[in-house]
């Protein structure tokens, strides 16, 4: 609510502190497990559900008219909602975006007639959290709570919650679509992908990667696509940036690829080795798990393929300013791809449970480092 606006700068700290406590608690539990015990254990959902309910209410009802910048585009969404509520019209940005993100704006227009802006943001938070939670639970019921903890501990979780609302909801719905594809419910998976693109057209990329990974699921092809994308990007990356900008399926994405100015700062086009290193972590783990340890199943291959095929497209455009916005279209499933093999396969010959606990801690530690550096 607006009376909490003076406390806006502490909202991220509250999120970080609570997730830190949850992560450290799970770390201390898993770290004590003998060898492969983490694989056979079921994890309690109760604490996670309490956090998710708190997050939906507290952050869904966040101050929306503050200009402090702590909540990204929240103010833009709020002003658009206000125009709909008071005058029944969109602003210019909304009028442009409704052509592609049609479902999001249909829901926004309907909600503007029956609720205030804070309830609408809380509804959008439900649309973000619930599909992700349901997807994690369907993918791996025994370890679903830990999969979700990996998700909420990733650096993009909070950003999708308060800034990239449409994109976050779309990606969350794709996670649920992945889970249904694993269960061979192809019709519902396709419907959910269609719904996801209605929230944000860029969801076409991970949706296409999902269906591609179902039909082209051999690991060697995934690695060939990803490594090939790196080679092509290194060789002719600048030309690819220009080509993708001209051919982009999303006008906003094309603008991002061409934009050289960000918040008053002139940035350079360069190969983002830092982003690539981050993206490679679940891929390196997959290489070791699949090719060295010979451990995988159809669920893991579908998760890995969705991530690697989508990430390969980003690698092709890696030199572009704001290429991280394309990377998010694969990074949203990164935590699940990272956690799934650790919780289901005997990946490490020694101290598997302890190493899994350390990876959980390091995963959230990376989020902490980015926050401190930011």
Residue ranges and their predicted role:
Residues 1-5, 29-125, 336, 370-374:
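TM-lumen/periplasm interface segments of multi-pass membrane proteins
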Residues 41-48, 222, 295-307, 352-360:
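Membrane-interfacial loop-to-transmembrane alpha-helix junctions, especially the N-terminal start
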Residues 70-78, 85, 90, 105, ...:
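Alpha-helical transmembrane segments and terminal signal-anchor/GPI-anchor hydrophobic tails
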Residues 123-139:
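Transmembrane-helix motifs of polytopic, lipid-linked glycan transferases
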Residues 136-153:
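Transmembrane-helix signature of polytopic, membrane-embedded enzymes
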Residues 226-227, 347-369:
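Signature aromatic-anchored transmembrane alpha helix within multi-pass, membrane-resident enzymes
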């Amino acid at each position: 609510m607006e009376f909490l606006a003076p406390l806006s700068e502490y909202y991220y700290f509250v999120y970080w502190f609570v997730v830190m406590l949850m992560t450290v608690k799970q770390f201390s539990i898993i770290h004590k497990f003998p060898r492969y015990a983490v694989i056979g254990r079921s994890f309690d959902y109760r604490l996670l559900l309490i956090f998710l309910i708190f997050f939906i209410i507290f952050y869904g009802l966040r101050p929306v008219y503050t200009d402090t910048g702590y909540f990204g585009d929240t103010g833009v969404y709020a002003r658009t909602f206000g125009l709909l509520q008071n005058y029944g019209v969109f602003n210019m940005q909304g009028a442009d975006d409704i052509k592609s993100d049609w479902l999001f704006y249909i829901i926004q227009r309907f909600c503007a007639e029956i609720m205030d802006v804070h309830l609408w943001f809380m509804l959008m938070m439900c649309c973000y959290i619930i599909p992700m939670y349901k997807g994690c639970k369907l993918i791996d019921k025994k370890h679903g709570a830990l999969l979700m903890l990996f998700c909420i501990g990733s650096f993009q979780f909070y950003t999708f919650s308060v800034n990239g609302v449409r994109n976050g909801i779309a990606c969350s719905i794709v996670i649920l679509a992945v889970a249904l594809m694993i269960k061979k419910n192809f019709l519902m998976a396709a419907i959910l992908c269609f719904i996801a693109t209605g929230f944000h057209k860029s969801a076409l990329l991970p949706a296409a990667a999902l269906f591609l990974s179902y039909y082209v699921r051999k690991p060697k092809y995934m690695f060939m696509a990803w490594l090939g994308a790196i080679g092509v990007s290194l060789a002719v990356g600048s030309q690819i940036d220009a080509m993708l900008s001209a051919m982009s399926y999303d006008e906003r994405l094309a603008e991002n690829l061409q934009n050289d100015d960000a918040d008053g700062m002139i940035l350079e086009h360069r190969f983002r080795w830092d982003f690539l290193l981050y993206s490679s972590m679940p891929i390196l783990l997959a290489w070791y798990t699949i090719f060295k340890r010979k451990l995988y199943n159809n669920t893991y291959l579908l998760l890995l393929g969705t991530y690697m095929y989508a990430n390969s497209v980003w690698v092709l455009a890696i030199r572009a300013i704001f290429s991280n916005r394309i990377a998010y279209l694969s990074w949203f499933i990164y935590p699940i791809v990272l956690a799934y093999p650790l919780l289901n396969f005997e990946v490490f010959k020694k101290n598997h449970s302890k190493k899994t606990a350390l990876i959980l801690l390091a995963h959230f530690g990376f989020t902490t480092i980015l926050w401190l550096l930011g």
